[in-house]
C-alpha cells in the first residue's frame, strides 16, 4: 500500500466532484480505503431512531468521507492547491514539501 499525501490536520482543496472548489481541514484519514473526512465537505443526513436519550429521533447532518484523489493540499506560502513531494530530511526522516514553491509542509 502506498503512503498517502494527505494527513490529519491538513488544509485541503477539493478538486473534483460535487464539492469542487471547497476548502476544509482533514478530520480523519482512512488508510485502507484511501478516503478522508474533510470538515464541511460531503455533508449527508443520517436518520436517528428514537431512543431513551433522544425520544424524538430525527436527522443528523455529518460529513461523509471523500476519496483522496479528489483532494490537494494547500501550499502554506501561496494558499493555492499544489502537488506534494517527499524527500529525506536532515535527521533521515521523510518530509513533505510543495513541488511548486519548495516549502516544507508540516
From Swiss-Prot:
InterPro entries: KOW (IPR005824), Rib_uL2_dom2 (IPR014722), Ribosomal_uL24 (IPR003256), Ribosomal_uL24_KOW (IPR041988), Translation_prot_SH3-like_sf (IPR008991). One of its GO terms (molecular function) is structural constituent of ribosome. Gene3D superfamilies: 2.30.30.30. CDD domains: KOW_RPL26 (cd06089). GO terms for biological process: translation. Keywords: Ribonucleoprotein, Ribosomal protein, RNA-binding, rRNA-binding. GO terms for cellular component: ribonucleoprotein complex; ribosome. One of two assembly initiator proteins, it binds directly to the 5'-end of the 23S rRNA, where it nucleates assembly of the 50S subunit. One of the proteins that surrounds the polypeptide exit tunnel on the outside of the subunit. Belongs to the universal ribosomal protein uL24 family. Part of the 50S ribosomal subunit. This is Large ribosomal subunit protein uL24. It comes from Azobacteroides pseudotrichonymphae genomovar. CFP2.
